[in-house]
Amino acid sequence: MNELTTFDPFHSDLLYIKRVKSKPLMATRSRIGIELKDGSILSAYHHWDGYPQWLGRILETNYNTKEKVSELIDGGDMSSCWNDTVWGKDRTDGQKYGPEYYSARGEDCPPRLDKDMEEFFSDNEEYSYIFRNGNWFAYDMHQFEDMVAPESVEIPSGALAV
C-alpha cells in the first residue's frame, strides 16, 4: 500500500478516511457559512479537523471579520482553511498559512447557498459554523446519532500554537 493514498470511503454516508503509513486517519467534516441579510447562508465544505477545538479556534482567531469570512467562503470547498502548503507544494500566495481549496487541484466546488438554517444543517457534516453579526456560532450536528437536533457548542478561547 502507498504511504499516502487518496480518500477511501469507509462508510459512504458517514465519513471518509485517509491512510498514512497504512494507518487510517479520520476526517472531521464541517461546513463554514456566513449568514446573509435575508437569512440565507452562503457556505463552503471543510474536510479536515472540523471540531471546535481546532477549526472553531482558527475561525475565531484568523477569520474574524465579515471580509475575511467572505473571502474564505468565496474560494469554495476546501481540504483545510489553515494549511502551510497547497496540495503538497509550498504556498505561493505570500501567506504562511491559508486555505487549501479543492479548486487549486482543478475541482469545481463553488460555495453553496442555502435558503435558511434548516437547509444549511441538512448536509451531514459533523460540525457547522455560522458567522452571524460579527460572531462565530458552532453546532454539533450529532451526525452519528439518529434523530438528535443540532446542538450549539462553545468554541474554546485562545489561539492555537503554530
Model-identified regions with their sequence ranges:
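Short, extreme N-terminal segment that most often corresponds to the first beta-strand
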Residues: F7, Y16-Y51, L55
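N-terminal low-complexity, intrinsically disordered "leader/linker" segments enriched in small/polar
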Residues: H47-Q53, I58-V69
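Low-complexity intrinsically disordered segments
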Residues: T61-V162
